[in-house]
């Protein structure tokens, strides 16, 4: 990997991928929509080039892909914009092919797997999405894998669970930390008794960059699981205890979400995804750990402590 481009570098995964590339001395282009956000994240890094571009536009994507050999695609959209995922992938792949990019890595989540058929979900688990958003994510994956099969470039998919941590305030978990620090009641979607897993977002950067650096890891999908299986209730309790507060939270179920959806477009998108909170979706990353000789995972106690410390320094 001589030079990489991070598509979606303004997000939390992209930020920590960029920090790891810089740590390794690998030149990279940080691409996102907002120049000020990118400059804040990467402007002082010696190996970073900041490019503000509209990645839904062919010209913007072409500018972003020019002169790099590897694209690490971490671009995300809101729930109300999910139909854009396949379109954005087509634009990025066209740009990559035209620019002669050699490798294209997609970072995604667990939606394409659907409801688990096994206790742990390995890369060989069938992809049978049960939600429209899962179907759109599967379509995105299929487009990339088909490009790899056609020989346009080498491809890879890395799947992550829900994450939390510094700069991840758009995640499901981070608002709970904010509520705990303020002594307020946290909101959660769905039941809290189900086993879940969470990834401390800084842990993702080194793993993604290591995979991207290895030619023998392409042509495959890789799971990177969270620190451990934990009930959402236990996770929330740990957050409040670390903040020195008594746990306070409320949950919204399917009926409440449908009512809220009458007034809020985002809430309208949530009921179909409740299966992720009602059924344990726990990744099996034995293949990845075996390939890389292990992978560092920050414990929940340590990750929660670091996240609270970061939020105290970044109160908004």
Name these PLM-found stretches.
Residues 1, 210-270, 285, 290-291, ...:
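Mid/C-terminal beta-alpha module of Rossmann-like enzyme folds, strongest
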Residues 4-26:
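N-terminal Rossmann NAD(P)H-binding glycine-rich loop of SDR-like oxidoreductase domains
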Residues 36-99:
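NAD(P)H-binding glycine-rich loop region in Rossmannoid oxidoreductase-like domains
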Residues 90-136:
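Conserved Rossmann-fold NAD(P)-dependent oxidoreductase catalytic core, especially the SDR/UDP-sugar
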Residues 130-157:
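Active-site Tyr-X1-5-Lys
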Residues 150, 157, 161-195, 239:
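NAD(P)-dependent short-chain dehydrogenase/reductase
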Residues 197-204:
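A conserved structural motif in NAD(P)-dependent oxidoreductases
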